[in-house]
């Protein structure tokens, strides 16, 4: 993403360095720990997804070093700060949003004067969270990762990633696993297949939205006819419309093609179908 800047965080990096790098740019800043090995689809969640706030890559972990509540980082750890009950691990990559420029600069400037010990990336996350700057939690799953000073551990994960089909990882990540029970275990099972077909034939997310809308309208027409079999056919069409409606978002996440028009079109057609 050409609108972003990237800064690799080493053991020598300080909070002041990060603050100055962010201050001297008008672009969002990606921070990556030199000891982190992260799959490209996971980094894409930070770099290519539309974001209005800062975000940090985290992975589910019982008693982890980070606490996430309602998809936002609520508490974080460093060498000088500990989380009492964590439910995620910070993977070692985050995005600082220029939409929060002043709060971020104030938080980092204030934190840098305290002289807390620890990795500058961890201290940055702690500083933002404690200053109540919004940091969205971007989940890492479907592929291994590591944040370790051990070269052996990093090489092990790199070798594992080299054997994985990243397109399959993108598809699994696009297929949301945090929806309701019926969506996860029924609708999304079928939508994933349709999404893969859409990728292969080159259909756009907006085209999928219109197809779902057309199926939904025809389902409504069948309901209006009032005959038992037509109502049954309409009910089947409505389920198909709902499944197809999952595909536009999955396709957008897979291809990383997001637009305000697409979001508006999806919202409007959903309301009409309802």
List the model feature ranges, each with a label.
Residues 233-274:
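Acidic (Asp/Glu-rich) catalytic motifs at the cytosolic membrane interface
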Residues 12-17, 63-65, 143-145:
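A short acidic, often aromatic-flanked loop/helix-cap motif at beta-alpha or helix-coil junctions
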Residues 37-131:
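Conserved core of the sugar-phosphate nucleotidyltransferase
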């Amino acid at each position: 993403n050409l609108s972003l800047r990237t800064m690799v965080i080493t053991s020598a990096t300080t909070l002041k360095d990060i603050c100055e790098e962010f201050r001297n740019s008008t672009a969002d800043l990606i921070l990556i720990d030199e000891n982190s090995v992260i799959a490209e689809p996971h980094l894409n969640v930070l770099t290519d997804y539309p974001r209005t706030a800062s975000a940090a890559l985290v992975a589910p972990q019982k008693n982890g070093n980070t606490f996430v509540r309602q998809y936002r980082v609520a508490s974080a750890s460093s060498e000088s700060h500990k989380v009492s009950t964590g439910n995620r691990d910070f993977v070692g990559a985050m995005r600082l949003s220029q939409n929060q420029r002043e709060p971020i600069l104030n938080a980092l400037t204030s934190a840098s004067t305290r002289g807390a010990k620890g990795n500058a990336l961890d201290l940055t996350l702690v500083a933002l969270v404690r200053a109540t700057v919004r940091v969205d939690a971007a989940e890492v799953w479907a592929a291994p990762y590591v944040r370790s000073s051990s070269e052996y551990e990093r090489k092990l994960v790199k070798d594992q990633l080299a054997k994985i089909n990243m397109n399959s990882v993108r598809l699994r990540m696009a297929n949301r696993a945090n929806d309701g029970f019926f969506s996860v275990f029924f609708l999304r099972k079928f939508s994933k297949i349709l999404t893969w077909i859409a990728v292969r034939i080159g259909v756009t997310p907006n085209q999928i939205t219109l197809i779902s809308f057309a199926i939904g309208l025809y389902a409504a027409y069948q309901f209006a006819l009032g005959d038992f079999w037509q109502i049954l056919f309409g009910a089947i069409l409505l389920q198909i419309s709902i499944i197809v409606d999952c595909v536009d978002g999955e396709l957008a996440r897979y291809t990383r093609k997001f637009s305000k028009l697409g979001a508006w079109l999806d919202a409007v057609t959903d309301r009409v179908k309802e």
